[in-house]
Curated annotation (Swiss-Prot):
GO cellular component: nucleus
Keyword terms of this UniProt record: Developmental protein, DNA-binding, Homeobox, Nucleus, Transcription, Transcription regulation
Main location: nucleus
Coiled-coil ranges per UniProt: none
Region of interest (Disordered), ranges: 148-195
Basic and acidic residues compositional bias, start-end: 171-195
UniProt function note: Transcription factor which may be involved in developmental processes.
Top-level taxon: Eukaryota
UniProt cross-references to InterPro entries, sorted A to Z: HD, Homeodomain-like_sf, WOX13-like
Protein name per Swiss-Prot or TrEMBL: WUSCHEL-related homeobox 8
UniProt-listed Gene3D superfamilies: Homeodomain-like
Length: 267
């Protein structure tokens, strides 16, 4: 009996699925409200996917534009020039001769790295002569300043080396001055020694004469009248060293170190 009921119920289910054309029917899984919610979800997912694609493109373009930023530096700008030309990160910037000349002139006139506004103005001016960005201008001034400091630090070393080379070359420069004949050097040395001995002999004689004159003055002071004075001059003139001394004085070549017009104080 239960079997008959189950068979009857299965027959009713077949009748429910049946109907329509040819007896082929379908089972309605979702209601109309559920279908509408599903359509809305699909539309939202499609919008999200489109937004993700746009975000990916924007991020990729931004990474390409900021690839030249300096890490740890607050000064950063996209590698875009006012003309709209884009310089990729892998492309090395090389200034044109005109750009290099303008940059050198600005560096010589200014003090160090220009301000950010000044860099923008320089970039706008240099963009007329080729591709360039603000980062290129900033980096160029930094590198140029570093090269200038290294060059200034190397100047004292070059001066020291030049002085050392001059000291090394000085003996060779002085050598021709001493390359005189040997007999001339010997003659000059003998002449100098002779002059020294003459001066020493003259000083000795002068000292002896001065002592004699002091002694004669003492003796004449003790004597009386003109007789004492006559005896003093007789003693002086009778000394044979006086004749030798007068001959030395009268001879013009005896004392070449004394110039004309000069006097010699005997007292």
């Amino acid at each position: 009996m239960e079997w008959d009921k189950a068979k009857a119920s299965s027959g009713e289910a077949v009748d429910d699925r049946g109907g329509g054309e040819g007896g082929l029917g379908y089972v309605k899984v979702m209601t109309d409200e559920q279908m509408e919610v599903l359509r809305k979800q699909i539309s939202i997912y499609a919008t999200i996917c489109e937004q993700l694609v746009e975000m990916h493109r924007a991020l990729t373009a931004q990474q390409d534009s900021i690839a030249g930023m300096r890490l740890g530096n607050l000064y950063c700008d996209p590698l875009m020039v006012p003309g709209g030309h884009k310089i990729t990160a892998r492309q090395r910037w090389t200034p044109t001769p005109m750009q290099l000349q303008i940059l050198e002139n600005i560096f010589d006139q200014g003090n160090g790295t220009p301000s950010k506004q000044k860099i923008k103005d320089i970039t706008a001016e240099l963009s007329q002569h080729g591709q360039i960005s603000e980062t290129n201008v900033y980096n160029w001034f930094q590198n140029r300043r570093a090269r200038s400091k290294r060059k200034q630090a190397a100047l004292p070393n070059n001066n020291a080396e030049s002085e050392a080379e001059a000291d090394e070359e000085s003996p060779t420069d002085k050598k021709p001055k001493s390359d005189r004949p040997l007999h001339q050097n010997i003659a000059m040395r003998d002449h100098n020694s002779e002059r020294i001995s003459e001066m020493h002999h003259f000083d000795t004689e002068h000292e002896q004469i001065r002592r004699m004159m002091y002694a004669s003055n003492d003796s004449s002071s003790r004597s009386s009248g003109s007789l004492g004075q006559m005896s003093f001059y007789d003693n002086v003139m009778s000394n044979p060293r006086i004749d030798h001394f007068l001959g030395k004085v009268e001879s013009p070549g005896s004392f070449p170190h004394m110039r004309s017009g000069e006097s010699f104080d005997m007292y």
